[in-house]
A protein has these predicted regions:
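...with weaker cross-activation on analogous glycine-rich loops/strands in unrelated enzymes
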Residues: 117-178
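Glycine- and charge-enriched low-complexity intrinsically disordered segments
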Residues: 183-196
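Solvent-exposed, polar/charged alpha-helical surfaces in well-ordered, non-transmembrane soluble domains
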Residues: 75, 79-83, 104-108, 139, ...
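C-terminal motif of bacterial Sec signal peptides marking the signal peptidase cleavage site
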Residues: 37-40
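Post-signal-peptide N-terminal segment of Sec-exported extracytoplasmic proteins
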Residues: 48-98
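Catalytic cysteine-centered active-site loop
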Residues: 64-65, 87-140
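Bacterial signal peptide processing site
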Residues: 42-45
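Bacterial N-terminal signal peptides that target proteins for export
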Residues: 3-30
């Protein structure tokens, strides 16, 4: 007489009722949800940046101090952005109480401190008006963009000395990072000056 499969596998060892494997529909739904979360800061139609591809962007050896065109508003943006470090990331979030995604953080800070209305997604921000800025000409409150193959998927606020504030991803918090880090250097697509 053959032993039952459950006995051979030690099924009695696991508590609870045996459950059937998830249906394909559930797996497809889970996959779709994960894809939506991975798109986090994106949104809208894909916009190709006219900035050089990340492979050709050279970061300066040292980060020169560049005076912003509007120092008072740039300082207000800078201080507010740094003050939000530690706020939880939340996809679609745009307030300190609810948390921030990358473009929600940028929108909130510029609206709150400089009375500037900006587009809501990182892609739309990259395509918005304002001069493109070379890495060695970055000034406080400039927007820095990241992505793959020229498609913008992420945005942060430059604060000086090669550093920027951003809301990175699910499970993280608003934080300071350095443009010289391996990841951000490889994904850098360009910068724009909003305050003029």
């Amino acid at each position: 007489m053959k032993p039952e499969l459950g006995a051979a596998c030690g099924a009695a060892h696991y508590p609870g009722k045996a459950r059937p494997a998830p249906a394909r529909g559930c797996i497809a739904l889970l996959f779709a949800c994960v894809c939506v979360l991975l798109a986090s800061c994106g949104g809208g139609e894909a916009v190709r940046s006219n900035a050089p591809s990340s492979a050709s962007v050279k970061m300066p050896r040292s980060w020169p101090v560049v005076t912003p065109e509007d120092p008072e508003r740039a300082n207000a943006v800078l201080m507010r952005a740094i003050g939000l470090v530690g706020t939880p990331y939340r996809w679609g979030g745009n307030t300190p109480e609810s948390g921030f995604d990358c473009s929600g953080l940028v929108n909130y800070v510029f609206r709150d401190m400089a009375n500037v209305a900006l587009p809501r997604t990182s892609r739309d921000l990259a395509a918005s008006k304002g001069p493109r800025i070379a890495p060695e000409r970055l000034a406080a409150a400039d927007l820095v963009f990241f992505g793959n193959g020229g498609t913008v998927t992420h945005v942060g606020i430059y604060v000086g000395e090669g550093r920027f504030v951003h809301a990175p991803s699910t499970g993280g918090t608003v934080r300071l990072d350095h443009l010289d880090s391996t990841y951000w250097r490889a994904h850098y697509t360009g910068a724009r000056r909003v305050l003029r």
